[in-house]
């Protein structure tokens, strides 16, 4: 049976459990589990990492841990009772683990590695804590390290600041909010402002001395020198070096280094230097022989200095090399370091160029104990400590020092009868009173043990030597008396024996007879003469002699005259036990001189403070001894002396001695009667304060009152102990009288001078320290009443001195911080007076910082859960006194501007935060009773209204993001919890008092506004938190957003008809709330919108306002990243359900649908905008949203905003044409008026005319950059008209020049024609604006199908490319996936006159072929009926699909949606007609190009003629004859009579063209190709005979073929899918011939270039029953065009191999050898004059199997070749230039074709008209549709490596083109030769259906361009002359100006103007 667990609540998994048993819970080792129930060795519970999944697991798998349970029951919370630091470490490391991996993903390597080291360090420290073997101090140290690293990691990762107390996390529920704030602020300030260390230490390590002339041992002496004061400031660090310059004791590294300690900040300045003096030990002269002398002398060697400023920049861990200078003049040795510092080192020599002293220096900061811990490895070896000279800045009690510093300064000696000066050495000894030498009390420096004697260094031949050597004598105090120092002087001989001869001595006693030590300063000692054998061991012989000249001069002047020798030393005593002050000794020995007591007491103030504190206890005993001796006589004097000593301890240097005095009072003070005299004297001083003129002494007394009361209280306690409590009442009366005097003194006002105020301030400063002393004698309530009366006596008038006000407040603050205030009984007495003074200051807004601190302390004492009666009463008092003023104060200080300086800003933030914390503390402590009392305290509704408005405003301020630092989440959550609790209380008051007739809009609006911004706080968005953090917040506070949301809903429902006041104002705020991804909150809040719609419907009959506001806010909110797909669905479903029964349901559904659709588009837009690069999705999504705002919502401002967003996207993607069209949308909204427009987006305030002008110029610029110059010309004309109307001729001139430049660009610059692709987006995973729709996209320059398909797959990486072109079924539409269907389509231009006119250059026509395109199509061949295996063309039909777009391309996007599709089936006969028409047109073009020398060689024409004639001879067109001219077909298809006749006409026309072509070919064919030409002529006659043609009539021969537009025309778009009858098999063939320098072009049979769309189709190749499938292709060329060898044609595949989903692998390799399509190169690099598609040919170089490429090193102009005058032009007067001279070619004109009257094909839903020819840049792709009329002899093509077989069964054709890089064609042709005459062809009619009516486009309409040719006429031979039928047209007219041209019938016709545009809409003031 499962039973709930009592103690087993928490455990850690010690072995992984798979949970394979029923209800098993899968656990991993290390997981923590919470246990709910147990049963027979099993537990039931959950893992803390996933508390939602509960299950069972074996109890043996879990290690139980102690834990405490909070909130027992269903929602119990288990907290482990282990060390809180361990718990925090565990949870923090888990959080870090996830984030640490993310750092690696984000490539933040530095932080990644640093955090890894910190995590490992924390784990190691965690193990140390868990083991539990650490001492208390070590444990504290480890925890400090742990928390420091946890805080560092949290800060680096952007996590929350953790409040801590004693290294443990603090639960905010367990402490007051003010205390929580202080903890947070302390940690935050500690993080931001590191504490500057007050103590510094210098670590010095000696490495070596590098010098070339070593060989003797050395002494190195380090010290710190103050160059400003010219004195050393530290002891010396002494080190011995061996002969190699290395430390002498290598086994003792601690001797190599020292720590110079206790350097204050004042010592860290640039004039403090490290000085190094080096002394050598050896011979007198450095150059003497080694054996010259056996005696060793100390001799000067060198000196080095270093400024300590060089170390202040940071830690110097690298060794420093100090330059060592040698002293040339030994007499200056004592000041060598000073001269080097002063840069006077030129007088010294360096020890060597590479010489130097290698040292390591490091500056350490902090307390010495901290340094010991951090550098324990150094201190563990006993590194020497080098002290400062004298005491530290702070003298610590108990510090024992007795150091006498002796500096051997200088000496004056006589020659002693010698001719040269002496070499003097000084030897020093310390001798005690018995004459014995004291051992080991002479210290040369730290690092060297003390010695018994000292030998000075020797200066060579110097009778006035100066040494300046500092020595320390650490002599014990007990050995000082009677001891003296003896100095012996010896002359050091330089002779071989090296003798030292004693010639004199000096001595100095250490202590004088009166007990004073040797005074500090310089002492000139007498040098007493003596001999070497003089016995100085007997001290009695010389101690009676005078030792100092100063003393001797006073006693015996005559004796002094005998000696001129002297010796000077300087002494300095640093002792805590001995004194040099006689006055101090006199005071301590007062009993021996009673008569001097008064004088001694008076002189006490003159004694140095360090002397007093050294003998503090003795001094105090002396004072109270004198007081006991005669209190009447010495009472006031002793009191003053005591005050002086007390105040001396206030000095920072001596404040550490306060505990010494406290100890004295508690343990050593024995003055039981002293209290009487102390009270009496103190009262005497207080009574005279108001009368005294000088208050300085009185203020000193008041300053000392704390310790005076301590002495009074201790004295009274001693008296009570001694007497059993006698005179208690008397004592109380004395205290009462004293305090009455104080109260009187405090109540007085300062009159005139501020002295009284200063005295009052001094008293108040120290008065709170008295409380604790009074509590030792009086009851708490008594003391509280005394203090209350005293503080109450302060003057409350506001005009008193501000400084006194501040001191008064400080006194209040100290009172609150005192022990007295912590007691509830005394606190209740003191609280009113504290609050009274606080109220006054807050009301005046004075001393806010101090007020905040006091308030914080007040609330720190009130715990959260304290429900004691006294606490409740305190809260009552505080609420009544301070709540209102506290709210006003917060409002006041938060409305002020923040100070600029950082220090003031911190102070400002602190005071604001503390007041906020105080308010929150107060509100958290308030209970229902407090709130009720508060609300009842307002007498009128106006007062209540003001209070509610005030507190709501404050709450809004409190939840501002800047109120607390961003990582203070704990504080924010606590604040929010208090706010929501308070709001719940106050909402009742709102309902009860401000509804119905008392309704107040302002207060309700303030309430709702507060609630909304409360919910929207960033710190409450739990979705952004880590799982562990979210869990903690939910456990402690729940989701406060839902609570507040429910409150909003409840309050809204209470409003009733007053809801109308908040519609539509609250729609936006509420909408923002509902966008928060919290399901419960959304379910609560969304229904409010239904309520708003309902009330708005009641008021106005509609809810337009609601709709408008919803739409406006949705855009801005969703652009901020709010909202998601779930919200859209929830919004839709909830509101639809709500309005089901409403009468206005229909309009409501419409609104909801509109808003939902807008959300769909906004979500798509936001998702797309997250992408990095600009792609089609971004642009398409923006277009969708833009159109939605315009068409469905009519939101003009939003529409314009998105126009500019789209414009920016286009510019970024360099879609300049689309950018121009986009900006044109805004331009159309404006008029040429002077209406002023406001500033909007990037536009300044300007008139509508100016903005429209600016837009025009910008659009023209973009059309220019996009090479859409025709559109730019239209806008140039429009703006020129405006300039002309305003007579602005300057700008008019510029505009006309700009227009002219655009015309030049049309004629001179090349333009690449884009490909067009149809893209289908299927499946539900696509964005809304693409889902299950098809589009036609305009490709980028040079972009082919493969590249486009790859681009689309990159944009949609999860999409699947469909492998067929069939319409997808419904399963694809509804699939939860993305499917892409892509294939190329052919643009069908609108019928425009410019495309059919003669003489219009192709540069002009090319624009209209690919611009303003609404219609596109592609074809699919299929068999209908029985398939004839002998002639498949009988049953081969073509399915032609036409696509109509919603807008023409190009436009505001590179792609537009397909609005309509039409499918037409073309019969086999119609297909045959198209094939022949296009092949004839191709032939005409090639012949024309050859005739006018536009071809670089004749190979293309040769190939084309060969293909057509060969195919015809071998049965080509006979297939058509067999299929359509037989009797059976004619009888069975009587309706096709006209079409059959048309087919026959085309055959005859082809024969005429071929004959004329052969004549031209013969004229230009090179010699090596003559055999081929002869063969073609022979085969042509065979072909004619096969067609039943013998000879053309004479009249037909008389006229040449007339080519309209100057060339034979290939109308690829008129019938692009013509199919020839012999296309059933694909037979690859190779030609054995490869002609160098000869172009080979495909010239397959009757199928033409117009069958381009068939190139997208895969047809049957072997089996006649195969289904023909559509294939993607980047081009739309035909099977047999001159460009049929495109990259998409393979030798074995019947369709494009490019991205072909059905192409087998064996075919795909052929792409590598395919030719480039012409559009892959600049058109002029292929042919000089771009005229017609059939004229664009690609030169393929045949050689080494290399594919042709456009030279990448050539610029576009270099690749282009300009056109030349045509020799076919009837109005040319000059013959064409040779191409080698001019590089220009031009095509002959092409005659117009009459309209055909044939009927369209059957099964046609819509038949498109015959469009103009395709762009010259269009590459051609071999169409699958075979042609029977092209054939090449096997001998020509059977084995050619670059030629492939035709698709005709058994009929070969050239399907690849080969070009050469050079051509000799132009050199072989006579420029004057004329073409051969050919018969005039039969007119070719065209057929087609009606073009559907198109909607108006927003793009500039195409305009007709009639250009009068500038070519000079060239006469033609009579045989080729063509009658003049028309004159070339003039230039295009200006808009609205009628232009006419001569037509063929002689009539004039007016040039049609541009397509009418809609009237511009009125635009708002944008």
UniProtKB/Swiss-Prot annotation:
Is Transmembrane included in the keywords of this UniProt record? no
The entry lists its GO molecular-function terms as:
GTPase activator activity; guanyl-nucleotide exchange factor activity; PDZ domain binding; receptor tyrosine kinase binding; SH3 domain binding; small GTPase binding
Every SH3 domain range: 6-67
PROSITE patterns assigned to the protein according to its UniProt record, in alphabetical order: C2_DOCK, DOCKER, SH3
Phosphoserine is carried by which residues?
A: 1599, 1607, 1614, 1618, 1620, 1631, 1769
The record's listing under CDD domains reads: C2_Dock-B (cd08695), DHR2_DOCK4 (cd11705), SH3_DOCK4_B (cd12049)
Intracellular or extracellular location(s) = Cell membrane; Cell projection; Cytoplasm, Cytosol
Q: Where does this chain carry the motif SH3-binding? A: 1788-1794
Q: What is this protein called?
A: Dedicator of cytokinesis protein 4
Q: Where is the composition biased (Basic and acidic residues)?
A: 1941-1954
Q: Which residues carry this modification: Phosphotyrosine?
A: 167
Q: In which tissues is it expressed?
A: Widely expressed at low level. Highly expressed in skeletal muscle, prostate and ovary.
Biased composition range(s): Low complexity: 1672-1703, 1838-1863
Region annotation (Disordered) maps to: 1648-1729, 1742-1966
Annotated ranges, domain DOCKER: 1190-1596
Q: Name one GO biological process term.
A: positive regulation of vascular associated smooth muscle cell migration
Membrane-spanning segments:
none
Query: What is stated as this protein's family in its record?
Result: Belongs to the DOCK family.
Describe the location of the C2 DOCK-type domain by residue ranges. Answer: 401-574
Compositionally biased spans, kind Polar residues: 1795-1809, 1864-1873
Query: Which residue positions does Phosphothreonine occur at?
Result: 193
Q: Give the species.
A: Homo sapiens (Human)
Query: How does this chain assemble?
Result: Interacts with nucleotide-free Rap1; functions as a guanine nucleotide exchange factor (GEF) for Rap1. Interacts (via DOCKER domain) with RAC1; functions as a guanine nucleotide exchange factor (GEF) for RAC1. Interacts with the SH3 domain of CRK. Interacts with FASLG. Interacts with ELMO2 and EPHA2; mediates activation of RAC1 by EPHA2. Interacts with USH1C (via PDZ 1 domain).
Q: Does the keyword Cell membrane apply?
A: yes
Q: What is the effect of changing residue 1718 to L?
A: Found in prostate and ovarian cancer cell lines; abolishes ability to interact with CRK and to activate Rap1
Record keywords: Cell membrane, Cell projection, Cytoplasm, Guanine-nucleotide releasing factor, Membrane, Phosphoprotein, Proto-oncogene, SH3 domain, SH3-binding
């Amino acid at each position: 049976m499962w039973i709930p667990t009592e103690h087993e609540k928490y455990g850690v998994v010690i072995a992984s459990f798979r949970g394979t048993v029923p209800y098993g819970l899968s656990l991993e080792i290390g997981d923590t589990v919470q246990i709910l129930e147990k049963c027979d060795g099993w537990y039931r519970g959950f893992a803390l990492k996933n508390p939602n999944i509960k299950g069972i697991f074996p109890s043996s798998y879990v290690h139980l841990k102690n834990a405490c349970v909070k909130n027992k029951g269903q929602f119990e919370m288990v907290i482990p009772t282990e060390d809180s630091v361990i718990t925090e470490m565990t949870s923090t490391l888990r959080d870090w683990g996830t984030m640490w991996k993310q750092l690696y993903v984000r490539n933040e390597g530095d932080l990644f590695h640093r955090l890894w080291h910190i995590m490992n360090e924390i784990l190691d420290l965690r193990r140390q804590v868990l083991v539990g073997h650490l001492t208390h101090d070590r444990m504290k140290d480890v925890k400090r390290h742990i928390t420091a690293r946890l805080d560092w990691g949290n800060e680096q990762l952007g996590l929350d600041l953790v409040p801590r107390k004693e290294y443990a996390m603090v639960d905010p529920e367990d402490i007051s909010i003010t205390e929580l704030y202080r903890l947070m602020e302390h940690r935050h300030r500690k993080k931001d402002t590191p504490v500057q260390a007050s103590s510094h230490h210098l670590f010095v390590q000696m490495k070596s001395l590098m010098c070339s002339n070593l060989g003797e041992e050395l002494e190195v002496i380090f010290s710190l020198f103050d160059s400003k004061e010219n004195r050393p400031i530290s002891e010396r660090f002494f080190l011995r070096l061996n002969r190699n310059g290395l430390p002498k004791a290598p086994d003792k590294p601690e001797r190599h280094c020292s720590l110079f300690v206790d350097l204050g900040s004042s010592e860290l300045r640039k004039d403090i230097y490290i000085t190094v003096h080096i002394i050598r030990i050896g011979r007198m002269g450095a150059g003497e022989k080694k054996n010259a002398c056996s005696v060793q002398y100390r001799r000067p060697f060198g000196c080095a200095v270093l400024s300590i400023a060089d170390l202040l920049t940071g830690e110097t861990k690298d060794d420093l090399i100090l330059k060592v200078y040698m002293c040339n003049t030994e007499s200056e040795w004592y000041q060598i370091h000073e001269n080097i510092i002063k840069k006077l080192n030129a007088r010294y020599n360096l020890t060597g160029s590479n010489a130097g002293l290698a040292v390591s220096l490091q500056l350490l900061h902090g307390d010495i104990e901290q340094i010991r811990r951090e550098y324990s490895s150094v201190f563990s070896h006993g590194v020497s400590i080098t002290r400062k000279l004298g005491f530290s800045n702070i003298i610590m009690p108990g510090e024992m020092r007795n150091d006498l510093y002796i500096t051997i300064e200088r000496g004056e000696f006589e020659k002693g009868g010698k001719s040269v000066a002496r070499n003097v050495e000084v030897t020093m000894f310390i001798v005690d009173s018995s004459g014995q030498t004291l051992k080991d009390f002479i210290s040369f420096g730290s690092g060297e043990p003390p010695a018994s004697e000292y030998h000075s260094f020797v200066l060579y031949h110097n009778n006035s030597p100066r040494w300046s050597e500092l020595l320390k004598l650490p002599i014990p105090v007990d050995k000082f008396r009677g001891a003296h120092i003896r100095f012996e002087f010896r002359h050091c001989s330089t002779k071989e024996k090296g003798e030292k001869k004693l010639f004199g001595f000096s001595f100095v006693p250490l202590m004088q007879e009166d007990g004073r030590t040797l005074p500090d300063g310089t002492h000139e000692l007498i040098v007493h003469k003596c001999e070497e054998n003089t016995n100085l061991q007997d001290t009695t012989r010389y101690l009676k002699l005078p030792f100092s000249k100063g003393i001797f001069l006073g006693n015996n002047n005559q004796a002094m005259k005998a000696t001129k020798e002297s010796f000077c030393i300087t002494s300095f005593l640093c002792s805590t036990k001995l004194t040099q002050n006689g006055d101090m000794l006199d005071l301590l020995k007062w009993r021996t001189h009673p008569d001097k007591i008064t004088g001694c007491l008076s002189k006490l103030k003159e004694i140095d403070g360090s002397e007093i504190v050294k003998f503090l206890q003795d001094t105090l005993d002396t004072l109270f001894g004198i007081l006991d001796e005669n209190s009447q006589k010495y009472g006031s004097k002793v009191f003053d002396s005591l005050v002086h000593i007390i105040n001396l301890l206030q000095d920072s240097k001596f404040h550490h001695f306060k505990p010494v005095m406290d100890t004295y009072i508690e343990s050593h003070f024995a003055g039981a009667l002293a209290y009487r005299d102390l009270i009496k004297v103190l009262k005497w001083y207080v009574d005279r304060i108001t009368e005294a003129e000088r208050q300085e002494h009185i203020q000193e007394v008041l300053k000392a009152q704390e310790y005076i009361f301590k002495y009074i209280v201790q004295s009274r306690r001693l008296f009570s102990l001694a007497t059993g409590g006698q005179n208690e009442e008397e004592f109380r009366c004395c205290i009462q009288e004293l305090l009455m005097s104080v109260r009187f003194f405090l109540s007085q006002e300062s009159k005139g001078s501020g002295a009284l105020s200063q005295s009052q301030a001094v008293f108040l400063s120290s008065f709170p320290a008295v409380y604790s002393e009074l509590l030792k004698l009086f009851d708490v309530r008594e003391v509280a009443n005394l203090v209350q009366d005293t503080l109450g006596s302060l003057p409350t008038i506001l005009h008193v001195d501000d400084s006194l006000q501040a001191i008064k407040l400080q006194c209040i603050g100290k009172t609150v911080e005192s022990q007295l205030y912590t007691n509830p009984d005394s606190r209740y007495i003191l609280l009113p007076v504290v609050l009274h003074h606080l109220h006054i200051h807050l009301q005046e807004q004075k001393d806010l910082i101090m007020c905040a601190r006091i308030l914080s302390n007040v609330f720190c004492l009130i715990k959260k859960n304290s429900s004691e009666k006294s606490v409740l009463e305190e809260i009552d008092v505080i609420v009544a006194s301070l709540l209102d003023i506290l709210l006003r104060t917060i409002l006041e200080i938060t409305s002020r501007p923040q100070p600029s300086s950082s220090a003031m800003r911190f102070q400002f933030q602190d005071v604001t935060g503390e007041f906020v914390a105080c308010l929150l503390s107060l509100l958290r402590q308030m209970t229902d009773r407090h709130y009720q009392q508060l609300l009842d305290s307002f007498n009128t509704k106006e007062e209540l209204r003001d209070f509610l408005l005030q507190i709501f405003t404050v709450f809004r301020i409190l939840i501002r993001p800047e109120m607390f630092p961003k990582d203070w989440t704990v504080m924010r959550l606590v604040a929010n919890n208090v706010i929501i609790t308070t709001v719940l209380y106050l909402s009742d008051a709102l309902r009860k008092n401000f509804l119905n007739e008392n309704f107040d809009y302002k207060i309700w609006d303030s309430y709702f506004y507060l609630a909304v911004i409360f919910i929207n706080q960033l710190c409450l968005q739990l979705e952004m938190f880590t799982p562990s953090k979210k869990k903690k917040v939910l456990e402690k506070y729940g989701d406060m957003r839902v609570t507040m949301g429910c409150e909003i809903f409840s309050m809204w429902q209470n409003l009733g008809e007053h809801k109308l006041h908040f519609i539509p104002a609250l729609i936006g705020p509420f909408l923002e709330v509902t966008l928060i991804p919290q399901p419960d909150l959304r379910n609560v809040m969304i229904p409010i919108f239904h309520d708003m719609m309902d009330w708005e419907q009641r008021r106005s009959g509609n809810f337009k306002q609601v709709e408008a506001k919803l739409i406006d806010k949705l855009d801005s909110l969703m652009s901020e990243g709010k909202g998601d797909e779930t919200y859209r669905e929830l919004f839709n479903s909830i509101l639809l359900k709500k309005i089901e029964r409403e009468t206005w349901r229909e309009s409501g559904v419409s609104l909801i649908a509109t808003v939902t659709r807008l959300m769909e588009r906004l979500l798509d837009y936001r998702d797309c905008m997250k992408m990095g690069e600009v792609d089609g999705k971004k642009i398409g999504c923006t277009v969708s949203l833009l159109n939605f705002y315009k068409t469905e919502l009519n939101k003009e401002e939003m529409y314009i905003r998105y126009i500019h967003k789209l414009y920016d996207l286009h510019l970024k993607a360099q879609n300049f044409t689309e950018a121009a069209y986009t900006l044109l949308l805004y331009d159309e909204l404006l008029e040429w008026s002077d209406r002023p427009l406001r500033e909007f987006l990037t536009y300044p305030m300007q008139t509508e005319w100016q903005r429209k002008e600016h837009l025009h110029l910008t659009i023209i610029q973009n059309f220019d950059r996009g090479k859409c110059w025709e559109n730019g010309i239209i806008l140039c004309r429009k703006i020129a008209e405006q300039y002309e109307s305003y007579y602005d001729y300057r700008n008019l001139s510029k505009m006309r020049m700009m227009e002219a430049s655009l015309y030049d660009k049309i004629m001179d610059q090349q333009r690449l024609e884009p490909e067009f692709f149809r893209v289908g987006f299927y499946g539900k995973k696509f964005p809304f604006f693409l889902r299950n729709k098809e589009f036609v996209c305009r490709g980028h320059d040079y972009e082919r199908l493969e590249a486009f398909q790859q681009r689309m797959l990159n944009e949609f990486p999860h999409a699947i490319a469909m492998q067929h072109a069939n319409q997808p079924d419904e399963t694809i539409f509804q699939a939860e996936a993305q499917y892409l269907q892509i294939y190329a389509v052919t643009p069908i231009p609108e019928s425009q006159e410019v495309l059919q006119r003669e003489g219009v250059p192709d540069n002009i026509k090319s624009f209209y072929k690919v611009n303003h395109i609404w219609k596109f199509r592609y074809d699919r061949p299929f068999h209908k009926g029985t398939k004839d295996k002998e002639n498949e063309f009988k049953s081969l039909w073509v399915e032609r699909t036409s696509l109509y777009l919603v807008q023409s391309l190009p436009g505001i996007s590179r792609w537009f949606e397909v609005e309509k599709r039409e499918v037409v089936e073309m019969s086999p006969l119609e297909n045959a007609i198209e094939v022949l028409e296009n092949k004839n047109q191709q032939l005409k073009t090639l012949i024309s190009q050859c005739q006018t020398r536009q071809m670089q060689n004749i190979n293309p024409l040769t190939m084309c003629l060969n293909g057509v004639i060969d195919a015809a001879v071998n049965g080509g067109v006979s297939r058509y004859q067999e299929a359509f001219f037989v009797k059976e077909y004619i009888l069975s298809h009587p309706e096709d009579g006209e079409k059959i006749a048309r087919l026959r006409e085309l055959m005859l026309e082809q024969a005429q063209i071929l004959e004329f072509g052969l004549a031209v070919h013969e004229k230009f064919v090179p010699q090596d190709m003559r055999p081929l030409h002869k063969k073609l002529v022979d085969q042509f006659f065979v072909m004619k005979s096969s067609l039943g043609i013998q000879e053309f009539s004479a009249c037909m021969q008389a006229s040449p073929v007339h080519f309209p537009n100057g060339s034979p025309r290939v109308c690829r778009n008129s019938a692009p899918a013509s199919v020839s009858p012999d296309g059933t098999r694909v037979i690859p063939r190779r030609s054995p011939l490869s002609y160098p320098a000869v172009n080979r072009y495909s010239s397959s049979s009757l199928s033409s270039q117009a069958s381009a769309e068939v190139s997208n189709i895969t047809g049957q190749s072997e089996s006649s029953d195969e289904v023909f499938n559509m294939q993607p292709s980047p081009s739309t060329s035909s099977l047999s065009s001159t460009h049929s060898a495109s990259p998409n044609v393979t030798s074995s595949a019947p369709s494009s191999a490019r991205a072909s989903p059905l192409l087998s692998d064996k075919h795909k390799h052929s792409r590598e050898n395919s030719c480039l399509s012409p559009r892959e190169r600049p058109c002029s690099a292929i042919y000089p004059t771009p005229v017609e598609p059939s004229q664009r040919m690609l030169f393929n170089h045949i050689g080494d199997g290399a594919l042709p490429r456009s030279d990448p090193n050539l610029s576009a102009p270099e690749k282009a070749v300009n056109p030349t005058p045509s020799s076919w032009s009837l109005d040319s007067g000059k013959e064409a230039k040779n191409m080698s001279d001019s590089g220009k070619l031009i095509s002959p004109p092409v005659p117009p074709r009459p309209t055909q009257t044939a009927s369209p094909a059957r099964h046609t839903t819509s038949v498109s008209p015959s469009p103009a020819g395709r762009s010259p840049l269009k590459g051609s792709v071999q169409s699958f549709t075979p042609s029977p009329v092209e054939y090449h002899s096997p001998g020509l093509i059977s084995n050619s490596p670059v030629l492939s077989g035709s698709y005709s069964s058994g009929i070969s054709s050239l399907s690849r083109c080969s070009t050469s890089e050079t051509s000799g064609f132009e050199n072989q042709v006579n420029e004057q030769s004329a073409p051969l005459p050919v018969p005039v062809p039969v007119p070719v009619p065209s057929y087609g259906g009606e073009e559907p009516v198109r909607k108006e486009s927003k793009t500039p309409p195409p305009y007709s361009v009639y250009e009068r040719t500038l070519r000079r006429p060239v006469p033609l031979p009579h045989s080729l002359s063509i009658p003049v039928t028309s004159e070339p047209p003039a230039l295009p007219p200006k808009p609205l100006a009628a232009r006419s041209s001569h037509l063929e019938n002689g009539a004039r016709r007016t040039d049609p103007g541009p397509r009418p545009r809609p009237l511009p809409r009125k635009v708002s003031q944008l």
